[in-house]
């Protein structure tokens, strides 16, 4: 019999966890953050080996998993797209069975949700989803921890996601918010509304938590009562060929100071999972400006650098929340119930 409700479990999608479990992980994240700030060791994974599989590139996810693993006393091993043969020269099942005999836990960041599920099914060790095309669960813990840090609560708050309403971040914000009792508004063009299956899943959780779900094209309706404005890139990895179409579609959904003022809330915060294209100080930004005449994309530089911005706190919280997930599922902690 295990002493923890989390021990040995994988973290593949938020919908697999109860409200109490997600709240516990957010609370554990805050505790581990405090230990880190006070330089108190918390080596719950001493002697463990962690595989970091990256089919998609990353800055924050890789850095967060690496530093979190080291803080916990584990050894992280990075395996990039050129190091792994998932589904190419070797099946995901076979790869999972090999890695599960060498590593104590596996992180996967890539395209297919089915692939991360197969890793969990066949490896025999906890697997953590660092991002797939469908879900971004580790990001959600960081997002909602950041919201809780700013407001002291989650239930009853209103978060508005602006932009591509059918990407992984929008899916995860919608479902996780519904589980946690957060009102989630998706402000998006109809062409990019979330899939009906995702909306119905969120609505089911919202009935239990009392959260309100809204999907709309109307800016005034979307930001009414907003506590949090959130956006993400207009073009997700693997969709670069749709750039012109997305820029044209999503210009009206940019987070700018006019939208902030519509919310009429001095306590409002702005979140972004990063990277953000808010100026032309990158090769990418310059290229977009030259091709499409847009110098600021999903968020203006004014909002990005404003008093409302909390995205760098949010980015730091990736490390603390990922650490909590790894410790809870692999660290033999005493968590008999939540």
Curated annotation (Swiss-Prot):
GO molecular function: amino acid binding; ornithine carbamoyltransferase activity
BP terms from Gene Ontology: arginine biosynthetic process via ornithine; arginine catabolic process to ornithine; citrulline biosynthetic process; L-arginine biosynthetic process
Annotated residues for binding of carbamoyl phosphate: 58-61, 85, 109, 136-139, 273-274, 318
Pfam family, one: OTCace
Main location: cytoplasm
GO cellular component, one term: cytoplasm
Broad class of enzyme this protein falls into: transferase
EC nos: 2.1.3.3
Location within or outside the cell: Cytoplasm
InterPro entries in UniProt: Asp/Orn_carbamoyltranf_P-bd (IPR006132), Asp/Orn_carbamoylTrfase (IPR006130), Asp/Orn_carbamoylTrfase_sf (IPR036901), Asp_carbamoyltransf_Asp/Orn-bd (IPR006131), Orn/put_carbamltrans (IPR002292), OTCase_ArgI (IPR024904)
Catalytic activity: carbamoyl phosphate + L-ornithine = L-citrulline + phosphate + H(+)
Binding positions (L-ornithine): 168, 232, 236-237
Sorted UniProt keywords: Arginine metabolism, Cytoplasm, Transferase
Pathway: Amino-acid degradation; L-arginine degradation via ADI pathway; carbamoyl phosphate from L-arginine: step 2/2
Keyword Iron: no
Biological role stated in the UniProt entry: Reversibly catalyzes the transfer of the carbamoyl group from carbamoyl phosphate (CP) to the N(epsilon) atom of ornithine (ORN) to produce L-citrulline.
PANTHER family according to UniProt: ORNITHINE CARBAMOYLTRANSFERASE, CATABOLIC, ORNITHINE CARBAMOYLTRANSFERASE, MITOCHONDRIAL
Family membership noted in the UniProt record: Belongs to the aspartate/ornithine carbamoyltransferase superfamily. OTCase family.
Protein name: Ornithine carbamoyltransferase, catabolic
Gene: arcB
């Amino acid at each position: 019999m295990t002493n923890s409700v989390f021990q040995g479990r994988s973290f593949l999608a938020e919908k697999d966890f109860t409200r109490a479990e997600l709240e516990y992980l957010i609370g554990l994240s805050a505790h581990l953050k405090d230990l880190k700030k006070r330089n108190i060791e918390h080596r719950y994974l001493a002697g463990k080996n962690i595989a970091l599989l990256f089919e998609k590139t990353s800055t924050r996810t890789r850095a967060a998993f690496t530093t979190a693993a080291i803080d916990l006393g584990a050894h992280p091993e990075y395996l990039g797209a050129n190091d792994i043969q998932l589904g190419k020269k070797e099946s995901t099942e076979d790869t999972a069975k090999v890695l599960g005999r060498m590593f104590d836990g596996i992180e996967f960041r890539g395209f297919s949700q089915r692939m991360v599920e197969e890793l969990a099914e066949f490896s025999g060790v906890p697997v953590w989803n660092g991002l797939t095309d469908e879900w971004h669960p580790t990001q959600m813990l960081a997002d909602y921890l950041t919201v809780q840090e700013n407001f002291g609560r989650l239930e009853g708050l209103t978060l508005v996601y602006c932009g591509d309403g059918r990407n992984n971040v929008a899916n995860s914000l919608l479902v996780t918010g519904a589980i946690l009792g957060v009102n989630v508004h998706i402000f998006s063009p109809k062409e990019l509304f979330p899939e009906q299956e995702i909306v119905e899943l969120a609505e089911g959780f919202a009935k239990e938590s009392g959260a309100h779900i809204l999907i709309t094209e109307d800016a005034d309706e979307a930001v009414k009562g907003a506590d949090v404005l959130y956006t993400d890139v207009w073009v997700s990895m693997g969709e670069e060929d749709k750039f012109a179409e997305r820029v044209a579609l999503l210009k009206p959904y940019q987070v700018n100071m006019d939208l902030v003022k519509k919310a009429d809330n001095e306590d409002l915060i702005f979140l972004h999972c990063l990277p953000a294209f808010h100026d032309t100080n990158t090769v990418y930004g310059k290229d977009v400006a030259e091709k499409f005449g847009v110098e600021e994309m999903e968020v203006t530089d004014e909002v990005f650098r404003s008093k409302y911005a909390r995205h760098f706190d949010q980015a730091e919280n990736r490390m603390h929340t990922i650490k909590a997930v790894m410790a809870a599922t692999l660290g033999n902690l005493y968590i008999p119930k939540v």
